[in-house]
């Protein structure tokens, strides 16, 4: 299965790009952007400049392909999450890039970004993920979010690709988690949810009585 994360390491900078949407559109835009990096790498010294460069290549692909996509009943739906620290950045940055080429940056008010199938994995992130969370806690929540999506969507499943970037390291560690690695987490999470439902009987007792139901023992 093709990775949906592209990691770029250069002289004094690191960037990773996560994507969702049509594979053909994604591959073309990333190819154009990688070629631009090879030609003009030293001109992109700030993260926002790199994101703007990727946005320009996305618009280029849109102008080339959108007419033909529409004729085939398809839509230009490429979304990207871009994390980077460039040579003149004083800290890492994380952006959500929309198909139109506009973007937003992560902040304390929005401690995570999510693309693709978002309906099922988003609730646990909204409830539990905080801007101050450690990388290890963020990984746990990310895996649980992935499992929640997998349980409710036939289009999502292992493997799961993960990237960790530490500030000022200018390097990123990557790992692809297979089904065997994720299965113990899936079993734990299923059991934890079932246990929480069982333990909810007492708080729900008054609600049950109010509509004529006998509370669980």
What are these language model-derived features?
Residues 1-217:
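N-terminal nucleophile
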């Amino acid at each position: 299965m093709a990775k949906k994360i592209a990691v770029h390491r250069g002289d004094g900078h690191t960037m990773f790009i996560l994507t969702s949407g049509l594979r053909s559109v994604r591959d073309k835009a990333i190819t154009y952007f990688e070629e631009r990096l090879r030609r003009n790498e030293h001109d992109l010294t700030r993260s926002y400049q790199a994101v703007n460069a990727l946005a320009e290549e996305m618009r280029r692909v849109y102008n080339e392909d959108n007419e033909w996509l529409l004729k085939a009943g398809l839509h230009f739906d490429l979304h990207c999450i871009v994390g980077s620290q460039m040579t003149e950045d004083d800290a890492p940055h994380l952006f959500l890039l929309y198909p139109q080429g506009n973007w937003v940056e992560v902040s304390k008010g929005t401690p995570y970004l999510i693309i693709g199938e978002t309906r099922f994995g988003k609730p646990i992130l909204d409830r539990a993920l905080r801007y101050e969370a450690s990388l290890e806690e963020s990984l746990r929540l990310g895996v649980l979010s992935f499992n929640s999506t997998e349980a409710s969507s036939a289009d999502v499943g292992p493997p799961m690709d993960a990237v960790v970037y530490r500030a000022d390291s200018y390097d990123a560690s990557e790992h692809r988690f297979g089904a065997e690695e994720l299965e113990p987490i899936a079993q734990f999470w299923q059991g934890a949810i079932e246990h929480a439902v069982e333990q909810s009987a007492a708080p729900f007792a008054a609600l049950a009585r109010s509509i004529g139901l006998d509370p669980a023992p």
